[in-house]
Swiss-Prot record:
This is U3 small nucleolar RNA-associated protein 10. It comes from Phaeosphaeria nodorum (strain SN15 / ATCC MYA-4574 / FGSC 10173) (Glume blotch fungus). HEAT repeats lie at residues 164-202, 490-528, 564-605, 987-1025, 1236-1275, 1605-1646, 1667-1705. One of its GO terms (cellular component) is small-subunit processome. One of its GO terms (molecular function) is snoRNA binding. Keywords: Nucleus, Repeat, Ribonucleoprotein, Ribosome biogenesis, rRNA processing. The lineage of its organism: Eukaryota, Fungi, Dikarya, Ascomycota, Pezizomycotina. It is found in: Nucleus, Nucleolus. Component of the ribosomal small subunit (SSU) processome.
Amino acid sequence: MATALQKQLAAIAASSTHQLDLKAQKSAHGKSLLFEPKIAASQSFETVYLICYEGFRDLCALDSRFLQFSKSLFSEQSKVEDRTQMTKEENKKLNAVVEAFITLVVNTPGFFNALQAHTVRVVKAGHQAPQMISFWSTITLEAVFGILENTSSGRRDIQSQKTEELVLRILPVLNSCMQAKYGAETVAACYSIVTVLAGRGELGEKVLDGLMEAVVLAHEADSLNACLQCLAVLAEQRSPAQLPPRVIRRLLKVPQLSQKLVQISKQCRVHRLTLGCALGALASIDRLEEQRDVFQELMASGLLTEAYTRAALAALVTSIRDSAPGSTEHGQLLDLAAQLAETTYFLDGMRAAAKSDNVDLESLGLTLAPALETAQIDNDEDEDMLDVDDVSSQAIAAPKVEVPDFAVQSFLELDASQSFAEVANAFERAVSTHQSSPFLASKSLGKENAMHSNLYLSLLARIWCSSQLPAARIAALRAAAATLKSAEDTCDFQNLIPYLLHALADPSAPVRRAAAACTVALSEASGSQANTSTWGSSKLYGSSGKAQKHVSQVVQLKSEDVSTLLSSILIPMLEESVMDPTFAIPAIREVLEGSKGSKSQPKHGMNAQTRTYYRLSFFASHLSLSPLVRIRIILFPIFNFSGKVSDTVRSNTILPLIQGWCTLPLAEASKVCDVEKVTLEDAYRGHLNALVAREAKSVQLLNELMIESLDSSKRLLAEAVFDKVAAVWPATKSEQRVTLARTLLDMSFKEGKDDGEKQCRERAIEILRNVKHDSATLLTFLESVPAAVQMPEGPPTKKRRRTSRNEMARVELASQDDVQRFVAKADFGFFELIEGSNPGQPSQPFSRVYSLSSTTWQPLKQQSGSELVYVQSMILGSLTPIVDTLKVSDLVVHGFMHANTVQQQKDTADYQSSVRADLLIDCIRHSTSPQVQNSALLLIANLASWVPELILHNLMPIFTFIGSTLLRQQDDYSAQVVDKVWCYHFTQTISRVVPQLAASLRAKHKNFLTGVSDLLLSFTAAFEHIPLHRRLKLFSELARTLGPQDSLSAIISLLADRYHNGKTQRRFSTELLLVFDPIHTLDAIKGYLDLVVDAAGPKRKVSDSLFGLNDKTAAQVETAIKNLLVSLADLATDDRLRAHVTRAFRRKDDPARPREVFANIVETTIQLSKKVASSPKLYEACSRVLANCLDLLPTTDLVKSAELLLVNTDHQVQIAAIKAVELRAGNAVQNDKKSVISLISFLPSVEKVLQQSQHTDAKIISVGCIDRIVERFGKKDMTAVASIAQTIAGSQALSSGNDTIRVLSLLCLTSIVDVLEDEAIALLPTVLPTAFDYLSQAIEGEKNGLHNAVYSLLSNIVERLGYMFSRDYLETALRLSHRSAVGGLEDTCDESRRTFYQNVSEHLGAQETFAAIKTTWPHALSQGFEASSEHLELLRSTVDLQSKSKLIKASSTLSEQAIDSQEEQEYDDEEMNQLDNTLMSRTCHGSEAQRCPPSGPFFVQLVDQEGPMSAKPEYAVTFYKFLAAFFDKFKSDCSRATQATSSTTQPKMLEHVAQEDADSELRSAVLGALQKSFQHDQDAFWQAPSHFGTILKPLVNLLTISATEEVTEVVIPTITDLAASSSSSIDNHRELNTILLRYMRSDSAATRLATVKCEQSLTTRLGEEWLGLLPEMLPFISELREDDDEMVERETQRWISQVEGVLGESLEGMLQ
């Protein structure tokens, strides 16, 4: 049973990619783009270099820029460079060189892509020129041709990939450009590209179909020929003959298609395109009659080859057959076929197509002229052996076939081959012309005397066993059957049985059926009488002198045995034999072998050995005497079984026969095979298949034939022999396998003189590598190694050489060539095969291999002047699996498995005595090859778990080597070596060795860490070189092996000291601690601190060995200690580590242990802080360590520890403890009740520190801790929070002189208000005045933090206790907010202030808020625009957020605010407009929210107090803007407001603004309000004559003002809206028109121009309704056409055109 060790080693061997894995090396080396894998694998680096260097010289001749690579990539040194041995930096530099070379040598696809994109853009824009298209097509054609040419060599998958990439780059361009609208030149250029692409590349069917459709759709009359040529090329590349439907439809529409195809056939092949067109025309005949003419023209064009013509005619016949008889389509097809049948060529083609499809043309309704039917095989013939020569009466007589002259008595004689060939050929012609009966009846063949003569039946038997056509073989079998049926009962035809068996294995089913019928006839003709005569018993194979020496005559079976063989064996298997050609021979072998499971075996069986012997002898004698190689190849498998009976026949007949054939001269064997039309290779393989693997004589013969095959003329024999050796090897017995192995090994080392020997050598090496070898074979290989006694004994004299330490002296062999040959032989023959075999019984090989490594290979290494890396690796690789097996044997010895213990123990002791660890250590330490080092380490690992006492003293050098060298390797194999060596074997070894090592160190009064310091330093030094994915596993195994209690702290501290608290080191240290038990983490921290204490003490012990402090100055020592402390402090902050340590305190088995360890950690930290008190940096670092270590504890334990630490008067300790609790409070979970209770219980302790401590830092951290606890868990215990609230609001916190404490206190009070809510009311009288005072100071001093903290508290009080926030508080807050708005503070201050405003708007009452807003409005105005804007924004938000009921209650206040808000300061226009807009928008929004438009008292009050004729006319602007906003907002709901400002106010204001010195802004505001009133007058207020007449005259009078721009933009639209509001009153319009007509005759040109523009606006707006007054206007229009002012004339003409457009008629006649 495989152990875990064996499985691991098997995993290494399976996944290893190192150079020692020959199969993997060969596979990797065989990857090439230029050569086949087999060729590439055989090429050396020297060969590859020469090939590359030749090309490189050519490149340098073309471009001198390549010369720079002659010193790098193409230097002599490049042949020996190994990337796996290069450093990461060296590989990076090499990559840069390779990339530079590739960039220089490859083509430039960027230009090609840019050219294609540019061409597509130009073509799509229609700007292409012939020169450009020619240039583009030339470049693209050359590029496509070149790419396809380059992809024509190399591996198939790479060719397909490159072709696909090219197609993906080219097809989009062709798709864009190959369109008829872009011109014939562009399309023709695309056709050329498609032609090259399809002709040179291997495209898929879908791509070809798509290209054909695109090509045919893009053609025009000018490009038709080019289109057809392109389609012809595409059709040649397609597999199916039918063209795509869209293509065939377009092609069949081409006039005179056949003539066009004939024209282009001179330039390219059009056969498949013509066939596709013909098939397409044939398929559409039923729809279009003209397609019949197209089909006929294409058939008659001569463009189709004979095969394609038959394909078209076959399609025609199939169409006739599949069409419905009597249908129109059927009639058309018959007419077409009849027309084609008038031509003999097409008639023969249709007949052939009909025969191949088994279609009777006459049954289809097609009557053809009679013709000679050719000979055919009827697959459905009966078994009645009818004469095959029956000829139809319609057949035309053919020339008579005569029998050639011959002079043989039997056609199975050895010399009858020539005569048989002539007669057989004549017989085949006779069969084809239905003359077989006359031919066989020829007197010379002796058919009448067939029972007593060998001539006739021997001819037939040889014919059906020959390579003649199936028809001839069938005719021969039928003729023989007919003869057997007419035979006499006294004749025995047993000698035909072997030949009938051959026929039953024929590959043709009709032949096997004929053979079955003949076998039945033979069985019926065989008589059971004892006195029957046997046909062929005399001279069947000629005279005995010509027979084989080992067989003189045919063995004859008894009549009853023949009858049994036929009736009980052959006849039952006939049915299955006819179905399966491979059934008959195995079935016969099973019967003869005596297999009871054979279906063919009769019940009474053939079990007698004598009977079996005679039957085998019968078949063997025929095979020996028959001249036919075919029959031997077929019947040889009958003898492929072992047994007493068969062994005799095989030894006497079969094996000599095989040997005789395989040793025939090549010319003679080739001649025999040529006569029978059998390949010589098949003949050799057929004979060798008769060899049996378990038979000694067969293996011996195979071994002899291997030697025979060294002859260069026997290459085919060699291939067959070696294939047979590989096939029989697994089943061969061990003794015979050793014989074959020796021969193969000898052949593998022969230096080939010719091709034959080279071939044999390669095949021998291949077989030895691929087959499995047992221990006996491997031992045979090892025994071939020369003994050490053949070498000179002892080292040379000291005068000549000195022997270096731990190395063997150099010795000399006979010559250097002997050394090289010996090494080469051992490389392959011994260790390579041994390594690849993994022997199961390694007893003998182990001792022998180890002996070779110590006595032979060390001298050879010295003698050869080389390290013999490959040989050493082979030796070590061979020993490793042997040791694995020996370890299993060792388990047997110790009673873990059942076996012969005494013998096993004796063997195990012998094997252990052969082990020499010093040799392996030398391999590790002195070899420069990583392969040798890795192999030696694997072997040592196995030995360590087997015989650990032998490597105990070499343990530390091995560890040091791994840490300093192997861990830095980047290759996968080194990783696996380290993993296996370290993780498994050395773990076991150290578990047995380390206790002894520790005991030894303690006995010598030495510290354990001091003893292993070198080991630890080696591994930590290699830390940064070890790949990331391997670090954790390696160091965890190191710590586990050495003991985590002692080693873990040392490893962590060494990493911290060496890498100075780097992120990588810190993260790794955390992960390493997480691997082990939580208690080990605490132990590691304690040990870490012990090391730091030792380093800080006056007498250092362990720290000197680990950190090398003796070599450092005092400052350097202090820095080192600081780095260690900082690293530990940072390490303790990791969340994962904290969670890990927490689990230590939750253990139930030993709960006291973690507390004891942690108490020691605290004590040690305090001791350390006292020691380094003189150094502030170290003291601070100790404080951090203490705080962070406290943070490692669970919450309950942390709080208890912190309470104890607060007793300490050292404020830094207090700060650390409180900070730890604060941090824990921020991370604690709400559901953790124990933690929450413990944290709340901590409040009195921290309150005490706040009250008593004189240190600001302590106060700051205390307030912060209280805030954190209250914020997160205050709701859990409101009583505790209430008790601490007074302290926070008192002199020690809120009233402190330190701004930081003030800020924290304010934030803490914010949290307290959140928790206490109503319970916090008592704090307000104390807190709010202080807060307002701090806010005032913050604004003046620009203290942003204090400012924001106050607003945070105020916002929270407003939100939680809004009903207690009085108007006085609010007014104070608003005034301070005004100052804050203009104070120039940060953006965060603005945000906090807006938050406060938002809370005021949402949580305070509307009445109080509006009152405070009104009261503080003057103050806001006095502070500036920002304050005023925010003040109004507060008004807006209050209106938005308050409910309807509250707004109604506060409506009077809101109205007063709106009226008072007009009294604004002197701001600039932009600010004024912004304030006005804000005020108007919010007032309207408030009214809308109340669902009561301002048409009541508010609006009357507003009009009376601030209306257009108030004491302050400048406020009228704001008033009318209000008015416009109201009208626009409430639309038809503002009728009462319209009435309030109509007759009494508006005319007066219009008269006021009509004055020249009136304010233009006021004028625009007044007209804007009027315009909105006109637009929304749905109650017809302005339509009333009283209202209309009142407003009309002052409004129209504004046309006379000098402000032309205002007239156009404001006055005229307002007049137009007034007219539109009275659209149904003609009187109002006439009144308006009268005034306008009067103004048309004004003396002022500006007035006349304004009046004309007003008329234009009215005409546009009112249309025909206004033009009803046209008769009154016409005289005035005529006058204006001749006005003195040019502008008036122009605008008048534009007005006339406008009127004509509305009326649809000219005014010219009316104006005359």
